[in-house]
Regions:
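GHKL-family ATPase ATP-binding module
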Residues: 1-14, 21, 45, 53-55, ...
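Conserved short strand/loop->alpha-helix "switch" segment adjacent to the catalytic nucleotide/phosphoryl-transfer site
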Residues: 26-45
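A short glycine-centered beta->alpha linker in the GHKL/HATPase_c
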Residues: 81-86
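Short adenine-binding "F-helix/F-box" segment of the Bergerat
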Residues: 87-88, 95
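Helical (often loop-to-helix) elements that flank the catalytic cores of nucleotide-handling enzymes
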Residues: 88, 342-354, 558-564, 568
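C-terminal interaction appendages of subunits in large macromolecular complexes
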Residues: 389-408, 423-428, 439, 443-445, ...
């Protein structure tokens, strides 16, 4: 950040007002994405992003987040503090303007912030509007100021309450339970975002403290993040369990046409592309022009180097852009003065000029790296050739999947017991472990809207398999065909084509034992790597069959955990010395059709767990660790999470 920008005065005059706040409570999803878990956590990100803006401007080094015991959130920073002087146009404190007017903030005054992710004032005023209670405290100019709000309305004027030798802003808010589906914060979700921010902003101290939970030492559970390595460290974290084929992470940063570009990348022995893109610290899940620019620059530069070095002379088929990205893990971070995001939740960058800026930056810096590191360059090109060879084989296998799919009209898998309903939004398919359990499920289901596809044994571990092996696997081919999806769209020959998807509920149903959990994980890994769009759209679920059946005469009750079993046994005994029959279900096949319907299939009674991806970064890391080749990280993960496991006696 330039000294000119760093020293720019940040006062009430810098706060610009664009529009009012009335619409936020009426249509919250327009501003924070949704009113579920994602939107709830988005409130925290908006407040934290304001503190990050201060850090980007060179005025903040510590940001601390607290989940309080009542599920309210406190975010503190040691930045300059939101201005409290009288706003000339509004005639009231700039702090009140920032907290109560949408699009009011220093972000819109280029002198205050060169770039900004969280829209300073937009985010925090949205948070205020969607909170039942909010309190802001500002330490600035040797004084402490405060103001409190209820559903966005000030309860009194900004007031001075003391003196201080610190600077910073402290915000505490409680999400409005009348707006959000639930108001319980998830420590792991917030932790993943703060870790991400620490990598993207090296040298900044971030912490998360959960005042609802005490650790083994009697202290509040706390996570602290600071990264000195930045994006290089981020890529190593993402790639922790994969085998790198290069001797170090490739890193470069620079600026082109006023767009600062930072890239860290490495190639590994896996077969998947794992690229994460950010604009002003915002995770752009859907990519955008910066990602397009990166891919264009990468492909063009590697292709030119490979052609000039003569390494492609013996390759008899065309190499595609995808081949240059197989086994690539990369993080791209750009800073854009006036970002144009497609969609209110900022997930796709639309600035056309960024494509050329990023493409040129990547080309220039990667060309230099390849010339300076010929041995590493040759390893990358050999990886590309291997990817192209495998893709050629995979294309034939994919074509088999497409030919066998419902789109070609050649029929559905013989093992599929389909439903009669044809509206996908009303249909559900159960992927059932084994033929015997599949038989029970077929008898117990509602044939009108429930389909059953039995899967034989453990499906292929796609994390360790080349693409053509995946598409040649019989069980996987059956899943593609039964679901009605295929590979390849007009825009991308490798993209999932969901135009003919036949079910909007895809339910994984396996035994409630270790083997069943392993099979469910294999299926989830397949969905994450090859049908991720179904997960992102909320179409993938996990069934929860009961673990126990308790019997006392004609009284029969099901329970889903050991704790629930113990409570029910005590309740059914009623203080008397009577025997309670306990049946442990180790497999779905041990239940008859009626029991399976009552507990697991009946929409009125069952519990389905929807599979979601709160953090693509964390999901990728966990799948790679659980299903990859490295044993020590997997063992450490299992030991750390052993308390959540169900162990069969």
């Amino acid at each position: 950040m330039s000294e000119e920008n760093k020293n720019q005065e940040y006062s009430a005059d810098n706060i610009q007002v664009l529009e009012g706040l009335e619409a936020v409570r009426k249509r919250p999803a327009m501003y924070i994405g949704d009113i579920g878990q994602k939107g709830l956590h988005h409130l925290v990100y908006e407040v934290v992003d304001n503190s990050i803006d201060e850090a980007l401007a060179g005025h903040c080094s510590h940001i601390d987040v607290f989940i309080n015991d009542d599920n309210s959130i406190t975010v503190t920073d040691n930045g300059r503090g939101i201005p409290t002087g009288i706003h000339e146009k509004e005639g009231r404190s700039a702090l009140e303007v920032v907290m109560t007017v949408l699009h009011a903030g220093g972000k819109f005054d280029k002198g205050s912030y060169k770039v900004s992710g969280g829209l300073h004032g937009v985010g925090v005023s949205c948070v205020n509007a969607l909170s039942s209670d909010l309190r802001v405290e500002v330490h600035r100019d040797g004084k402490v100021f405060e103001q409190e709000y209820k559903i966005g309305k000030p309860q009194y004027d900004v007031r001075e309450i003391g003196t201080t030798d610190k600077t910073g802003t402290y915000v505490t808010f409680k999400p409005d339970a009348s707006i959000f589906v639930e108001t319980i914060y998830n420590f792991d979700v917030l932790s993943a975002r703060l870790r991400e921010l620490s990598f993207l902003n090296k040298g900044i101290n971030l912490s998360l403290t959960d005042k609802r939970t005490i650790d083994d030492q009697g202290s509040f559970v706390k996570a602290e993040f600071i990264s000195e390595g930045g994006l290089k460290e981020f890529v190593k974290f993402l790639d922790g369990t994969r085998e790198s084929i290069l001797n170090d992470v490739i890193y470069f940063d620079g600026e082109k046409d006023g767009v600062p570009v930072e890239v860290a990348m490495v190639y590994n022995s896996s077969y998947t592309e794992n690229v994460h893109s950010y604009v002003n610290n915002i995770n752009t899940h859907e990519g955008g022009t910066h990602l397009s620019g990166f891919r264009r620059g990468l492909t063009r530069t590697l292709k030119k180097y490979a052609d000039n070095s003569g390494l492609l002379k013996k390759v008899k088929f065309e190499i595609s852009a995808d081949d240059f990205r197989e086994g690539l893990t990369a993080v791209i971070s750009v800073k854009v003065m006036e970002p144009q995001f497609e969609g209110q939740t900022k997930t796709k960058l639309g600035n056309k000029e960024v494509t050329t800026a990023v493409s040129q930056s990547v080309s220039d810096m990667l060309s230099f790296y390849l010339e300076e590191n010929p041995a590493q360059a040759q390893i990358i090109v050999q990886k590309v050739i291997l990817a192209a060879t495998a893709r050629n084989a995979a294309r034939k296998a994919r074509e088999m999947v497409q030919r066998k799919s419902i789109m070609s009209g050649s029929g559905l898998p013989g093992k599929l017991s389909d439903c009669s309903e044809r509206d996908p939004s009303k249909c559900e398919i159960f992927l059932v472990e084994g033929d015997s359990a599949g038989g029970t499920a077929k008898q117990g289901r509602d044939r009108h809207f429930q389909a059953i596809l039995p899967l034989r044994g453990k499906i292929l571990n796609v994390e360790k398999s080349m693409q053509h092996k995946v598409f040649e696997n019989e069980e996987i081919k059956n899943m593609y065909t039964a679901l009605g999806v295929s590979v390849g769209t007009e825009e991308d020959e490798r993209a999932l084509n969901t135009t003919k998807l036949r079910y909007h509920k895809v339910v994984i149903m396996t035994d409630a034992d270790i083997d069943g959990s392993h099979i469910a994980t294999l299926i989830l890994t397949f969905f994450f790597r090859y049908m991720k769009e179904l997960v992102e759209k909320g179409f993938v679920y996990i069934a929860t069959p009961p673990l126990y059946l308790l019997k006392k005469g004609k009284d029969q009750r099901y329970c889903w955990s050991d704790e629930e079993r113990d409570i029910l046994v005590k309740e059914m005994k009623g203080g008397k010395d009577v025997n309670i029959g306990i049946q442990r279900y180790k497999g779905l096949g041990e239940m008859n059709a009626v029991q399976l319907w009552d507990t697991t299939l009946n929409p009125e009674e069952r519990t389905l767990k929807r599979v979601t991806i709160d953090s693509a970064v964390e999901a990728d890391r966990v799948f790679s660790m659980l299903m990859g080749d490295e044993v020590p990280p997997r063992r450490a993960f299992i030991e750390a999470n052993a308390k959540y496991a169900k162990i069969d006696a």
